[in-house]
Amino acid sequence: MKDALDFAAINQAALAAFPAVLNRLLPGGKAIGGEIVALNPRRADRRLGSFRVNRYNGRWADFATGDKGGDPISLVAYLGNISQGEAARMLARMLGIETEGRRRG
């Protein structure tokens, strides 16, 4: 049986390391004010401007397509076209957070 994922803890850890996380997820992104503006790797994006991620709270949006989300896990899920659970596990691995197989006692 798999352990329950602590989405809140994973999101909190991701936000604490968000500059490095964003660098890895969106290489070439540019800091503009409190946001990272990057090309959207999910579409044939040729210009910076419409895909933005808030560096402090993790909210993100692609204003050209209407896609948006509220936290780092949803960003990873969107970019990888994967489920929220898969995204949480991927982000946890990236951050060195153990999510499964914990032994107690």
Regions found by a protein language model. Give the residues of each.
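N-terminal structured subdomain of primase-like DNA metabolism proteins
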Residues: M1-G105
